[in-house]
Amino acid sequence: MTAAPMFPAPMPRVGIAAVDHYLDRGFDSVVGMSSHFAAAVCCNLLKIQTELGVKGPIAEIGTFEGRFFIAMAHALQPGEKALGIDLFDWPNPAVIDRFEANCAKHGIAAERRITWKTDSRTMKPEDVLAKLDGRAPRLFHIDGEHSRHALSRDLERATAVMPPDGLIVLDDMLHPGYPTLMVAVQAHLEKHPEIVPLCIIDRQTIVGATKFVLCHRDWFKRYEERMLKVFKDNIWPLGADFEPHWCLVLSLDTRLADIT
């Protein structure tokens, strides 16, 4: 008889001291909505990239006060920078000061980050590359305006600057408050068959919602092979069926329904 999986499954560790320290002791003190679980997964993905020889900066649309941004920045290698893109006007203009203060408090020095106060609706792919000195971001986290049109636009920009070994992470997928976002993702995948879902990061709470991770089809197996080992305790057995593409589901709840 097969033993039932542990519930909840263990929170993944990253194995990068600065990342694990921040996730354990600083993450929850920074105002934001992304989950500890999603941050641990994405920082592990950055570590996997490094092990595979993937180099470069990262970018994020919707940086807010920096909760997720700081975690990812700690997973970068020396000389790699993190670009934070936001209007920085909600809930008040002082949010940019709180972002800068949070970065400084939690160890992301000014020379390791780029703060870009701009409207992603007017941003062009070449503008992103110019901010990064011509280097394509190896991971692009999209947590901007939660409308179908805005996500479609942000996805096109991220895809335009995505290197062959790059990753795109999408926030608040399958969220009951934003049901049409999935429509934008499906349309984008149909338009860009070279891009496929790499994994689904299950929600930790309704606030710490589900994320999708996308990659180039040619890199899917290379990433998946590493992920099967790194996330062995967090793999939901049935996976996700994107018809016909299949990908991993990572979760803190890997149980199946008991129907016996």
List where the protein language model places each region.
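A short alpha-helical cap/connector motif
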Residues: M1-H141, E145-V169, M173-T260
